[in-house]
Swiss-Prot record:
Sequence ranges of Low complexity compositional bias: 13-23
Region span, Disordered: 1-26
NCBIfam families xrefs: S20
Protein name, entry field: Small ribosomal subunit protein bS20
Gene source species: Akkermansia muciniphila (strain ATCC BAA-835 / DSM 22959 / JCM 33894 / BCRC 81048 / CCUG 64013 / CIP 107961 / Muc)
Name of encoding gene: rpsT
Length: 87
């Protein structure tokens, strides 16, 4: 167990950040699945709407540092390619 005040504070900070990062990561997974489901049904309008929500969430997560910027770009690129394939 931590012996100093600063170590106790670091434990609290880590717990808070871990909880926040888990929530954001979980939300991104859910939104990514919604985009995939919309692409699966070949509904371009629903896919575009889901992509806009997903893209915004990914950008926010990257800005805060929850995910790296390159990973955010990869997520958005893959989703955009999948939507573009819908005829």
């Amino acid at each position: 167990m931590a012996n100093t005040k600063s170590a106790l504070k670091r434990i609290r900070q880590t717990a808070t950040r871990t909880a926040r990062n888990r929530a954001v990561t979980s939300k991104l997974k859910t939104l990514r699945k919604k985009v995939a489901a919309a692409v699966e049904t070949s509904d371009k309008e629903a896919a575009a709407a889901a992509y806009n929500t997903f893209s915004s969430a990914v950008d926010k997560a990257a800005k805060v540092g929850t995910i790296p910027a390159n990973r955010a770009a990869n997520y958005k690129s893959k989703a955009a390619k999948a939507i573009a394939k819908i005829a």
